[in-house]
Amino acid sequence: MKKFLVIAMVALGSALFTNVNAQEIADNALGLRIGGNDGFGPEISYQRAVGSNNNRLEFDLGWRNHKHYDIVKLVGLYQWVWNIEGGFNWFVGAGAGIANLDDDRFEPYYNDGAYLLLAGDIGIEYNFDIPLVLSLDLRPELGFHDDYGAIDDFSPDFAIGLRYQF
């Protein structure tokens, strides 16, 4: 009976330890996030783990191109990450950002300027055995600007990301 209890404890401890390791996220990740809402474009993306509960900060600096305007934006998010199984994780987050709009539709009344935005985030990611992570996410954004119809106040931003973990 003692042998059975010892073996059961070792097996349970090994399973728990393996599960904890599978859930750990990298301290840092740097790469590209490519997607679009009001236009299509790339973002340079940096993630930094914070705390010990698989939470992280994500900062994205990017450019969106549309036939009538361009947007450069910086978004910061706080994300909570949960393991699904093995290398698969899912995450949710919330944050804010600032953007600059260059609108060339209505000359001479261009609607250029900066605006603030709030953002949410939900997605799924896969951590490969090599230090790469591939992600797919939806980031709904709510912009606070006087837009004269250039862009919507609400924009769902779908994107795919590839980041190097270190």
Protein language model regions, located:
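Positively charged n-region of N-terminal signal peptides that target proteins for export
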Residues: 1-4
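Bacterial N-terminal signal peptides
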Residues: 7-15
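Sec/Tat signal peptide C-region and signal peptidase I cleavage site
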Residues: 16-23
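Residues that define the transmembrane beta-barrel architecture of outer-membrane proteins
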Residues: 26-28, 38-42, 70-74, 88, ...
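Start-of-domain marker
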Residues: 26-56, 61
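Extracytoplasmic loops and strand-loop junctions of Gram-negative outer membrane beta-barrel proteins
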Residues: 27-28, 59, 105-106, 142-144
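Gram-negative (and chloroplast) outer-membrane scaffold detector with strong preference
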Residues: 47-136, 164
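Predominantly the C-terminal beta-signal and adjacent terminal strand-loop region
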Residues: 69, 129-166
